[in-house]
Swiss-Prot record:
This is Large ribosomal subunit protein bL31. One of its GO terms (molecular function) is structural constituent of ribosome. GO terms for biological process: translation. Belongs to the bacterial ribosomal protein bL31 family. Type A subfamily. Keywords: Ribonucleoprotein, Ribosomal protein, RNA-binding, rRNA-binding. It comes from the Bacteria. Residues 76-97 are annotated as: Disordered. GO terms for cellular component: ribonucleoprotein complex; ribosome. Binds the 23S rRNA. Transmembrane segments: none annotated. InterPro entries: Ribosomal_bL28/bL31-like_sf, Ribosomal_bL31, Ribosomal_bL31_A, Ribosomal_bL31_sf. Residues 83-97 have a biased composition (Basic and acidic residues).
């Protein structure tokens, strides 16, 4: 058998940044302590509390813009017709042309 074939293992402490929970496991990592973002004790999936995200997708953004435009058009006052007389708006038959 070859000597020094496996990496040396040591006890490494992992510490959660959000809940300060720490646990120690055997690992081949060279660092003695590693900070992780979230662990199983504070992760929403593992504790059973799923939080609703406030990030909206493309469809919600588009519908928000559409509703804002609709509200703007409802509050807008209609413009008067510029100089159109009854003669131009009246439909003519082919005989009149």
């Amino acid at each position: 058998m070859k000597k020094d074939f496996h990496f040396p293992s040591q006890s490494v402490s992992f510490k959660c940044a959000s809940c300060s929970n720490s646990f120690t496991i055997e690992s081949t990592l060279k660092q003695k302590e590693i900070t992780i973002d979230i662990c199983g004790k504070c992760h929403p999936f593992y504790i059973g509390e799923l939080t609703k995200q406030t990030v909206h997708g493309r469809a919600e953004k588009l519908s928000g813009k559409f509703n804002a435009g609709k509200a703007f058009l409802e509050n807008k006052t209609p413009k008067k017709a510029k100089g159109k007389t009854e003669e131009y708006t009246k439909h003519r038959s082919l005989n009149e042309l």
